[in-house]
Regions:
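An acidic-aromatic pocket/loop used at catalytic or ligand-binding sites
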Residues: 1-126
Length: 126
């Protein structure tokens, strides 16, 4: 894989095909992250770009609203905000320039609330 032309010399990120579509295997630096969340390990069989855990079972509706505002501030438009679904989760679908698509799922599980991000392959790497 070719090296990035950035000053850091970091390698270009990898991508994965999913049932949702092709995604980056990570999110770019500075991608909105809910305050107080921490990076979480793999929480399911479907690949995602990032997973964060909010301790204390953060309110999924509040987290979804915060993520929507943060992505809109970052110039992404909201395509849909669905929820609460039967399991208490919310799904935020956002779009950007050049066919960029982002999906953020917020799901309560036990004493944690997980935020998973699918960062579409058409989105800028960073």
């Amino acid at each position: 894989m070719a090296a990035s032309s950035s000053a850091s010399g970091a390698a270009i990120g990898t991508q994965t095909d999913t049932t949702w579509g092709r995604i980056w295997d990570n999110v770019p630096p500075g991608f909105p992250r809910y305050p107080g969340s921490s990076v979480a390990g793999d929480t399911g069989p479907e690949p995602v770009s990032a997973t964060y855990a909010v301790a204390g079972g953060g309110d999924p509706a509040q987290i979804a609203s915060w993520m929507q505002a943060a992505l809109e501030t970052a110039t992404f438009s909201t395509e849909a905000l669905s929820g609460p679904l039967e399991d208490g989760s919310f799904v935020l679908d956002s779009v950007g320039d050049g066919g960029c698509r982002i999906q953020v799922a917020i799901k309560p599980m036990g004493g944690l609330t997980f935020v998973t991000v699918r960062y579409g392959a058409a989105c800028p790497e960073g």
